[in-house]
UniProtKB/Swiss-Prot annotation:
This is Large ribosomal subunit protein bL21c. GO terms for biological process: translation. It comes from Psilotum nudum (Whisk fern). Coiled coil: none annotated. Keywords: Chloroplast, Plastid, Ribonucleoprotein, Ribosomal protein, RNA-binding, rRNA-binding. This protein binds to 23S rRNA. InterPro entries: bL21-like (IPR028909), bL21-like_sf (IPR036164), Ribosomal_bL21 (IPR001787). Part of the 50S ribosomal subunit. GO terms for molecular function: rRNA binding; structural constituent of ribosome. Its main location: plastid. Pfam families: Ribosomal_L21p.
Length: 118
């Protein structure tokens, strides 16, 4: 079992590992103009870091813990269909929605100045 961290971004918690890419709903702290490809990001909302057999838990977040990464590109999630119908009224409405996502890759996880790569 390698090094991983649990971060909070876009209203959800993600288990991230260095060298892998993930899709997040949004980065609330970033301006949409900054969300270009290869933009570097720092995520400070780190809930937990696991390195080999040691586990560091935050309450609610870890101090001096940073997940460094870069944005690959923005994309859309799967389309969901919303269908509203009023019975006996001939009222039907069908809508589609696709969530805007940002795909980012995690470069490193650091805690108290010590960087973890895999």
């Amino acid at each position: 079992m390698g090094t991983y961290a649990i971060i909070e971004t876009g209203g959800e918690q993600l288990r991230v590992e260095p060298g892998r890419f993930y899709d997040a709903r949004c980065f609330a702290s970033l301006n949409p103009r900054i969300l270009s490809a290869n933009a570097k990001i720092l995520i400070h909302r780190v809930l937990m870091i696991r390195r080999e057999s040691t586990t560091n838990l935050g309450h609610p977040w870890l101090r001096n813990a940073i997940v460094r990464g870069r944005i690959l590109h923005s994309c859309y999630g799967e389309k969901i269909t919303i269908y509203k119908m009023h019975s006996k009224k001939k009222v039907r409405r069908k809508l589609g929605y696709r969530q805007k996502l940002v795909r980012f890759v995690v470069d490193s996880i650091s805690s108290n100045g010590e960087e973890f790569f895999d």
